[in-house]
């Protein structure tokens, strides 16, 4: 997922370097971009969506071959936002998002699925979260926004646009009925990390 973002940034900086007459640096970055594109178009493509990352032993995170963490939202969104993936693959990847990560009945747009429980190699700290909480198959708002932006870029906003409301915790099905005492637990991560330590509970926004 980060490679798409890096590629997008590098392309912009190549233009700046050329404008400044820094040809050597621009050419070095251009060569790096060529290598990244090749890897993304080949190794990163999983047949129906893009894989999120690779462990040191070459095992992929976000692959259809996995039983946990089979698909990840960020890789699909940035494949579109970077403009570097072929358009047909962009559409296929976002169709996979709709099929696997969007849940209209509960108003959630998951970061990944299925949750990570016993996956080896471990994905690190996100695997320590309970299933459905934060990055471990919960809804993570920045990735949700990127997905809506990607859908808009593909001119299918009518299909995905409603997810912009799903990405807003105020529009949770239970939001209208929540009591004042519940608010700290629903919004603690948007206030400060210290607040989380003071109120160590998960919020409704994560779908836990």
Regions found by a protein language model. Give the residues of each.
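Acidic, mature catalytic/reactive cores of soluble proteins
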Residues: 1-162, 169-208
């Amino acid at each position: 997922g980060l490679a798409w973002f890096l590629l997008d940034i590098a392309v912009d900086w190549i233009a700046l370097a050329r404008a400044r007459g820094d040809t050597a640096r621009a050419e070095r970055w251009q060569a790096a971009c060529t290598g990244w594109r090749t890897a993304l178009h080949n190794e990163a493509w999983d047949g129906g969506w893009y894989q999120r990352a690779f462990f040191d032993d070459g095992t992929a995170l976000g692959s259809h071959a996995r039983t946990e963490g089979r698909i990840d939202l960020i890789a699909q969104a940035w494949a579109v936002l970077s403009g570097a993936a072929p358009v047909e693959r962009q559409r296929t990847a976002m169709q996979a998002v709709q099929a696997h990560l969007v849940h209209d009945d509960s108003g959630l747009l998951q970061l990944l699925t299925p949750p990570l429980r016993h996956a080896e190699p471990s994905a690190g700290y996100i695997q320590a979260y309970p299933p459905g909480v934060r990055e471990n198959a919960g809804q993570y708002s920045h990735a949700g926004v990127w997905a809506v932006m990607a859908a808009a870029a593909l001119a299918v906003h009518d299909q995905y646009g409603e997810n912009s409301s799903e990405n807003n915790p105020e529009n949770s099905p239970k939001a209208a009925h929540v009591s004042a005492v519940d608010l700290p637990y629903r919004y603690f991560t948007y206030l400060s990390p210290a607040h989380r330590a003071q109120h160590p509970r998960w919020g409704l926004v994560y779908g836990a």
